C-alpha cells in the first residue's frame, strides 16, 4: 500500500522522474521582479556581482518578470535591478553554495533610478529553488567540525538517509544511501572521482586543505548526473579571491592523549597513536578582478597501531603456535598538494584549471585485523595525480556553455610486510588467519593502475520560463593489473589444522585455492552519457525539472580463446534510458513552506571487477585458478601446493552471464519543509526505492543436487563429471548474474538553523529499512557479504537486511562562533571561541551468522549459515558517538590570527563495535554444536571504532 500510494502521488504530481542539482560546481541566482502591486516587470536589467572576485553577470527579465544567472562561481554576491521609472534595488549578503539555486525575488518601487533601495539579506531560510534531497556542508562547517581522521569523506555520514561507518584515516568510508549498498558517485569539482573496479571506492583521497564545500545529494539529482544508484558526493576545491588569504597549521596526537582501544586482550601496554599533521595553503589575486590562484599542501604522519587490534584468543594462538602482538604495528606517511588558477578570459569566458597530487605509504596495511595475524599483513603504496579544467562561456543573455576535461591516474601496490609469514596462507574458520601474506587477489604482489580521461560539455539555453540543457560526457578508462600468485588452505577448526600439520590427516582442510600463470593483464572500458532536461519555472511559486538521460557502457574485450564461451566477448549495455522529473512548490502567502517531490530511474556504474574476474580466471593454461576439496582428484596434501603451469590444475573459471544488465533503481521522494521565523526550518520526508538487476555471483556449473539440508538448501556432489557439473572440465564456473532485487523505505526528519549570531546547526533523524537478496562479495565491493550466496539454486534463501542496514540514525552538526557585545576582560574571555560538534547515534549494523564448514559442497567456504538461520539476522549494539572541536582565536593584527585547536574523537569513550567473529561450529547438516547467541554482541568482538582520541593543534591565518 505504501509503495502504491507513493508512486501514485508522484506520478500525478510530476508525471516522470527526479531532480535538480543543475550544476556540479557552480550555482544559480534567479527570481521574479515585480512592482509594488505584484505585477511582473519585463525588461529589468539585473546585475549579479561576485563580491569576492569581481565577476559580473547581467540578465534581463522576460515577459514573466523572471531572470536567471546560471553557472556562477561560488561565493558572496550582490544583486541589483534597474528599470526606467523605478528606484534601483540592491541586495548584498547573498552567499551562493555548490549546486544551489538562490531565489532572490525583487520588488521595485516607483521613483528615479538614481534613488537606491539597499537591502542586506541572504536567501530565504527555506530554499525555494531546491528540488533534490541533500545538503551542502559549507566552508564554515568544513573548517569547524571535528575531523581527527583528516578524511572529509566521513562528512557524508552527516547527511540524512546516509548510513554506514567512517574510516580513521584516508581510506574509504562505507556509505549507503537510498538502500543502494555502497553506490557512490564520488566527484571533485564535478569531475568523476570514482574508482571503476568495485562498488564503494573513490579514486583520489581528499584533504581538508583541498576542500571549500561538500555537496551531498542522495536522491533527486537531475538527468545531468548519473552512474550511481546511491548518492553523489561532490568535493569543491577552493579558489583565490581579490584578498590574499592563507593558513599554516600543525596538529599532533600522542599515546597519553588516547584511551585504550576497545576489545584489547592485553591491556598492559597502550599502543602508540602518534600523529603529526602539517598543512599550509594560500590564495589571492594574480590580477585583481581577473586572475586568482590557490595552492595547498598537507603531510600527515600517523601511527595506526591503536586502531588495529588483533583478537586471536590466547588458547587458539597457543594451539596454533602463534605469538601475536596485541596490535598490528602499522604507520602511514601521506602527502597532498593542490594548485588552482581561475582566469577571466573575457567578459564572456571564464577558465579554471587545477592539479592535485597524492602520495601514501602504509606499513602492515590491514584495516581491522581481528583474527588475522601480522604474518598476513602487507605494505601498501599509493600515488595519484588529477588534472582538470573548466571553461564557462556565455553567448548573449540566454546561451551558456560549460566544458570540463579531466585526466586522473592512480597507481598502487603491495609487498610483504616486515613480519610476513612464509608458505601458503592458512585460514582456520573462526580462530585465526595466518601463514604466507598472499591469500587473495589484492594481497602482497598485487599491482593496480587506473587511468581515466573524461570530457564533458553542457549547453544551456534560456527561453522564456524555460532553461533547456543538453550535454554529453565520455570517460575512457584503462586498467592495468598484476595478479597475486595466492595459495590458501581453509580449515574448519583448530583440531583439523593441527592434524594436518602433524601429518595425521593432511587432507582435513575444507578447501584449497591457488592461482598461477601470467600475473599481469590490462583492459579498457568506455562510458558515454547523454542527457536533455528542462528547468521550467511555471510561476514564481512552482518549478518543474524533467528530462531524460542515456548511459552507454562499453565493457572490456573478452578473452578470444577462453574455454568458457561467454568470456570470449561481453555484451555492450546500451539500453539504459533514465526518465526523471522533480518539482518544488512554494505554498502560502508568506512563502515559508515548500513541497518537493521527485521520482526517476537511476543506473549504476559498471563494476569492472565483474569483467576483470572473467579475464584473469579464463580457465586456460595461460592463467590457472584452482579450488579443490580434499576428496577431489589432484587435491594436495597439506602443506603442499600445486606445480604452476599444469593445465590439469585449472579447474575454476569466472564469466559474465550473457544476459547481464547494469543494475538500476527507481527512486521516489517527497519532502515538506517549513521555515520557522528567519532562522529555522523543519522538514519531513518520505522515500521509497526499488532496485533491479543487482549483481550476484553464482556457481552455475553445479547440476543434479544429491540431497538437501534440513532447511531445504541443496547439497551438491564433490565429484566432477558429466552428471554433477554442467561443464565437467571445471569444478566451478562463477558467473556474475544480474538477478537480484532490493527494497528501501525511509522517513526523515530534519531541523536546521542557519548561521546567525555565531550559531548554526543541522539535526536529522532517519527511520529506514533496507532489504535485498543480493549478497555481494568483496570481489565486487569494498565491503561484502563473506562468501556471497549461501544457496546456488534459490536466491530467496538469502533475502534479508543488507550488510549496512541501520534502522535508526540520528545525526547532527553544530557550529558555534559566538561574538558577544562585551568589552574588557569579559569580552576578551567570552569572545573568539569556536565550537564544532558532530553527533552520530545509530542502530548497529547486521551480523551474519556463518557455519565453520561448507555444508552444501558448493566449494565456497564461509558462505553457509547454520540450519534455519536467516541472513543478517542479528545486529551489533547501537553506536553512540560524539566528536568535539574547540578552538581559541588570538587576534594579532587586523587580518592575522593565531589559533589553538583541541579536538576529541568519541568524547565519552563509548564502546563501539564494528565486527564480531560470528562463525559457529556445526555438524554436517548445519546443526550447531552449541546454542547460537541471540544478540550480536554475544559473539567475540573482532574490532571497534575509534576509542577516545585527543588531538591538539596550532594554526595561524592571514
Language-model segments: residues:
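Periplasm-facing N-terminal accessory domains of Gram-negative outer-membrane beta-barrel systems
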Residues: 2-138, 192, 207-209
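Periplasmic N-terminal accessory/gating domains of Gram-negative outer-membrane beta-barrel systems
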Residues: 86-239, 245, 254, 258-267, ...
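Transmembrane beta-barrel wall of Gram-negative outer-membrane proteins
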Residues: 245, 271-361, 379-408, 579
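Short, solvent-exposed micro-motifs at the edges of structured domains
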Residues: 208, 274, 539-541, 555, ...
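Transmembrane beta-barrel strands of outer-membrane/channel proteins
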Residues: 121, 248-254, 295-299, 353-357, ...
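Solvent-exposed loop/turn elements at secondary-structure boundaries
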Residues: 152, 165, 558-578, 582-737, ...
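Short loop/turn motifs that connect adjacent beta-strands in outer-membrane beta-barrel proteins
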Residues: 223-226, 240-245, 287-290, 348, ...
